[in-house]
Amino acid sequence: MTDKELQENWNELLNIYKGILFNNCDFYNGINDKLTYDFACLQYAILKEKYKLKDIAKQGSELEKAIRLLSFFAPQITHKGDFQNNIGCNAIALLDYCLDKPEKGINCLNKSKILQECCLALGIYARRIWLMPYSPFDTENHVVIEIYDFSLKKWVMLDMTSNGYFVNADGVPLSVLEIRHNLAINITCEFIKTASTHEKFFINMQMERLYYKQYFAKNLFYFYVEAHNEFGNNNKRYCFIPKNFDLEKNIKQKSLSNIDIPPIGDISILLNTPE
């Protein structure tokens, strides 16, 4: 496939995925609960000291600090989609395993955990979000984080895998729900990379932006979010699904057991200011 054909293919897929989102804008009214965030984990002191997080993040807003962490760590971690999750899912164990070790890659699930815990260690509200596709035959998904910025008074999505985030027409960084909304109604939603160069797979930055735009559009149909955000894994999650979407049927088609079906949360949970 030529670069032009690839570009046309990604544009076509983008339009298909945006159409799916357009026809599924309204979310199910589920449990109205609050997510919690733990800033007191003893391991955060170790993480801050070992990796000099304050020196990396410097001063500024929560978003400015988080972007500096993203920009520092993302290029030093190799991506490995088929990583077996055989390392403890916490930033200390993961960074020890993969940082600046090209032969030891990890997946988005674990990359996002690193950035989340580095943010939490600096007192920044941060949570992982699983981005899930519409098709029950698509077993690939993505995991990112959101941080809360008090100057912007909003949540912002950051992605360790792509080393970037999305902005609207005014250049305002967007949350996961805002990215979904903008794609669904076909208004400006542009990918911004913190690095100035594109990955070798892409011929230029424009192609890289297009790829991630269609990739996110594919995976923004429904979401999982951890109920408690802390050091290490938390097994309790909420799911946020569009109306008329049969989550149980979808999961069964993917050959996952019923135990994997979390409670349905109200979408307002993702909009709330953290406390």
Please report, for each region that a protein language model flagged, where it lies by residue.
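Alpha-helical and coiled-coil interaction segments, frequently adjacent to or embedded
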Residues: 176-275
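Generic helix-packing signal
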Residues: 70-73, 112, 116
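Mid-length scaffold segments of soluble, non-membrane domains
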Residues: 103, 107-110, 121
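Short, contiguous, pocket-lining structural segments
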Residues: 61, 107-111, 137
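Hydrophobic/aromatic-rich core segments of domains that either
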Residues: 113-186
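RecA-like P-loop NTPase motor core of helicase/translocase proteins
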Residues: 3-6
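Secondary-structure boundary elements
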Residues: 8-106
